[in-house]
């Protein structure tokens, strides 16, 4: 059965790909882009190095614009990022019957609540899988065993998640993204860990 995994090139979505691949799913890594900035390069590189099929899906830039409006209003990114994630899942559920992502137990954003997951699955007759039952310590330990990981301060070149195009649009509108986004480290999968 084919599964579309929302893919940023990070360790969480990479781990989800490995788990589902080993369970026999036909894994297709999917990176979303809105045409504002080609944020897909890190994900494409990571997917290639891991040997997974990768697809970029371009969506209407209005989704990004609506999210940026929310972020400007809130002066904080959470609601805007969650809006994008919910919208992307709704759109992908028209094409895929199984959708997954790397959201984990401690994640706050992007994340669906339990009732939102049930609603999505029931309304669209799909399956939605994530890492909700797994905590960051387990994900870090497992990822460290499997992947070569690069860690860097978040910027538009370190990840392929929604944040990157949001940052570009905010900067074009004259906003200092460092005042809106809390500083954080992005982990990107470079490839499989080599046996020593």
Where are these regions (language model features)?
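Nucleotide-activated chemistry modules centered on ATP-dependent adenylation/adenylyltransferase
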Residues: 1-5, 9-196
